[in-house]
Amino acid sequence: MSSGIVGWGAYVPRYRLNVLEIAKLWGYDEGVVKSLGLMEKAVPSHDEDSTTMAWEAARNALMRAKIDPSEIKAVLFGSESKVYAVKPTSTIIIDSLGISHETLSADLEFACRAASVGLRLLSGMVEANRIKYGLVIGSDVAQSNPGDVLELSSAAASVAYIVGPADESSAIIEYATSYTTDMPDFWRRDGMPYPLHGEAFTGEPAYFAHIISAVQLLLKEGGYSISDFDYFVFHQPNGKFPLQVAKKLGVPLEKVKEGLVSPYIGNPYNASALLGLAKVLDIAKPGQRILVAPFGSGAGSDAFSILVTDKIEERQKLAPRVEDYINNKKVISYSVYAKTTNKYKVYE
């Protein structure tokens, strides 16, 4: 049995923070912002977190899938910013959406790639006929130390996919590959409030090497060429890297631009590349093929070949599009952002 994406959904908080304002506050040159290709980043309201956003995205995915939540038999949640250090978010999603208690669930961790791994796992479970439908969610309120360059891009958003049989799918998962190494490019030890990053490792040895390796493996094993794909979506830590990796792979930039989200909302970690995929699915036509390659620090990358079916056009209209969320925004000041996200602790 083949598997595919039956339904997809997204959620992006309404609040936006101007990236240039952050840069000026901490003394960064305007050229730094320009070089990153970022304009604004999405940030949560005081009552939003990775769990509430996950529920929003999953509800949208259910609307598109048009299935009863009780039919879902596996729920996987990928995040770097879980509300609880020890308590799964996937169980909260199960009860809040009316999913059966007779369901496999787990929270996954692999930096920005955990949800992508979940997508591969659910695809395999469906293909092995162990489940009919599974739900995977990538949701993050991305963490960054105030004043660190990461604060220019770290953002909040969520994306969800319901995986099921190919004959019911909006898009078929044709093939997938993975590439993984031990790479110290980004980490957060237990008890640390914010992650650290080894800047010498974040570019060529980590992001570019892993994505290129996963994509080249997909092309080789699947028998594809670059020209077989209509859209390419890469992990988006900023607006510059996905364009650079496209150039290295010989991908025309016009095949990348529709999947870009980071210039408008920043990098929402687990919802980065998969949110770009959702943005493409919102507009894709039957017969078009998409290559999506998420990346997670530590480090690893997956590459998927996804073929759009004739069921997609009906489902595109059933829930808000990623573009709708991008355009529905309210710009706030850094001080409001710092207050609503508890950036600074008050000790009495």
UniProtKB/Swiss-Prot annotation:
Please state what class of enzyme this protein is: transferase
Q: Which organism is it from?
A: Sulfurisphaera tokodaii (strain DSM 16993 / JCM 10545 / NBRC 100140 / 7) (Sulfolobus tokodaii)
NCBIfam families attached to this UniProt entry: HMG_CoA_syn_Arc, PRK04262.1
> Which GO molecular function terms does the record list?
acetyl-CoA C-acetyltransferase activity; hydroxymethylglutaryl-CoA synthase activity
Among SUPFAM superfamilies, the record links this protein to:
Thiolase-like
HAMAP family annotated for this entry? HMG_CoA_synth_arch
- Acyltransferase: is it a keyword of this entry? yes
The organism's place on the tree of life at top rank: Archaea
Q: Does the keyword Transferase apply?
A: yes
Task: Show the PANTHER family listed in the entry.
Answer: 3-HYDROXY-3-METHYLGLUTARYL COENZYME A SYNTHASE, HYDROXYMETHYLGLUTARYL-COA SYNTHASE
Cited Gene3D superfamilies: 3.40.47.10
Q: Which CDD domains match?
A: init_cond_enzymes
Q: Which reaction does it catalyse?
A: acetoacetyl-CoA + acetyl-CoA + H2O = (3S)-3-hydroxy-3-methylglutaryl-CoA + CoA + H(+)
User: Which key words are in the record?
Assistant: Acyltransferase, Isoprene biosynthesis, Transferase
The family line of this record is: Belongs to the thiolase-like superfamily. Archaeal HMG-CoA synthase family.
Pfam families noted in UniProt: ACP_syn_III_C (PF08541)
This chain belongs to the protein called: Hydroxymethylglutaryl-CoA synthase
Chain residues that bind CoA: K240
Pathway terms, separated by semicolons: Metabolic intermediate biosynthesis; (R)-mevalonate biosynthesis; (R)-mevalonate from acetyl-CoA: step 2/3
Q: What does this protein do?
A: Catalyzes the condensation of acetyl-CoA with acetoacetyl-CoA to form 3-hydroxy-3-methylglutaryl-CoA (HMG-CoA). Functions in the mevalonate (MVA) pathway leading to isopentenyl diphosphate (IPP), a key precursor for the biosynthesis of isoprenoid compounds that are building blocks of archaeal membrane lipids.
